[in-house]
Amino acid sequence: VGFPPQKTLTLFDTGSSDLVLDKAAYNPKWSLSSKNLHKQFDFSYGSQHVAGDLYTDKVAIGGVKASNVPIGHGNGDFNSGNGGTFGLSFSNSENSAFDVQQLPFTWAAKKQHLIQSSTYQFTLRPTGKATLNVGRVDLFELAGPITWSDKNTDHTFWRITTELNGNKIENAIADTGTNFIGGPPDQVKALLDNLDGVSVELAEDGSYGGFYSCQNPPHLSFKVLGQTFDFPEPAMNFGFNGDKCRLAIFSTPGMQEWILGSPFFETASVILNYDVRRMGFAKYR
């Protein structure tokens, strides 16, 4: 970020649309290319909250450097373990905390002719190398054909319908910024009840969770756009409860729709094409 560049670690988040950096992760005063927009922002991310000032600056990821990208510079540090959040959902008045005219990185890079296609390829292997390709699809990451969705009609989030062991999860938000798979309590319970090798428990807050034997994990797979992708055990494992493992699928209080978080992204190479608003899925090597 900036010039000279300030290197920082961000969470690439398909569930939000803004680039928000912690106070310690970026100092606009050290950048010759920063511009103070003299506007403020107020940003909520999960249970975290940050406010601060809006700037524009140079931003580079994956070898692609765009100029005049809006950045929220927090007045504190809100993102534990990361320097900030790099939003990759669709930017609009409903989804953005920024009241600015400047384009977010996804569109700025395309308009400035830095990439031919506004395409982002996530290949998140649960045990091994994870990559994000910007502006292109790396076919060497793939072990099979790409299946493409129809045009995404939601102007805020990426959405997809999938099946887990034959149980349909419909029109779910695909969100790399959430570290579990969740949905409405009654629907989560119904799905977990249908999974062999998974026991269902009700928590005091009314949420449902699934548990399985760590020595004998269930065989789970997602069916997406006609292709089947195994749910690897390291991706489905959300932690331990005694001698049992907690499944990374559970409900949380007040959850009204399904969210396919990062464990879902660890099952396939997932491609987001902003130009035609489609998602692609393929097996990874």
Where are these regions (language model features)?
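Aspartyl protease catalytic domain
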Residues: S67-N167, K244-S251
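Signature of the N-terminal lobe/flap region of pepsin-like aspartyl proteases
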Residues: V1-N75, N194, P217-S221
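Short hydrophobic beta-strand that contains or immediately precedes a catalytic carboxylate
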Residues: G2-F3, T8-D13, L19-L21, A172-T176, ...
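Pepsin-like aspartyl protease folds
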Residues: V1-K7, H38-D53, N79-S80, R136-K168, ...
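Short strand-coil-strand connectors
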Residues: V1-Q6, A60-S67, Q116, E163-K168, ...
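A residue-level signal for conserved active-site and pocket-lining positions in enzyme catalytic cores
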Residues: D13, V59, G87, V134, ...
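Aspartic protease catalytic domain
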Residues: G76, H219-R285
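Active-site beta-strand/loop microenvironment that shapes enzyme catalytic pockets
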Residues: T14-G15, G166-N194
